[in-house]
């Protein structure tokens, strides 16, 4: 599910898909055929999951699933009008187009999986990222505390060497306070 998918593979997949499935909106077939007619456009086509998170996305469904027939996302704008999507693609051929197809068995279909790419706009695993962030924060907190403790111990040693009882007592209290609040 990553790497660059050759245009030939994308076109072969779309030919197979259009032969095997009927899209809920016939304009979607026209749109996919239009994309296949231009290799430069196909270079910018990426099949992904969670396409709605992408800056420019086409989401299409076949008759055998219970999802929205067609949706075009462009930044925060959403439309169900395939003609608007066609016009946008024609006017902005250099922009990446992320396509998500809803059809029966999509998640296990080897033809679809072969052209499916990682969605760069979706964190790999949001839960994992949150856990890693917490671990990093805890590590940073322990590191700062360890540094502060070592610095206090160094300054306590200096106070002892200088026979500075007042500074020694103040720093000892700070060290004790730091250790109590670290548990």
Curated annotation (Swiss-Prot):
Similarity-based family: Belongs to the UPF0302 family.
Protein name: UPF0302 protein BH1670
Top-rank taxon: Bacteria
Originating species: Halalkalibacterium halodurans (strain ATCC BAA-125 / DSM 18197 / FERM 7344 / JCM 9153 / C-125) (Bacillus halodurans)
NCBIfam families on file: PRK03636.1 (NF002965)
InterPro entries: IDEAL_dom (IPR014957), UPF0302 (IPR011188), UPF0302_N (IPR014963), UPF0302_N_sf (IPR038091), Virus_scaffolding_prot_C (IPR027393)
Pfam families to which the protein is assigned, alphabetical: IDEAL, UPF0302
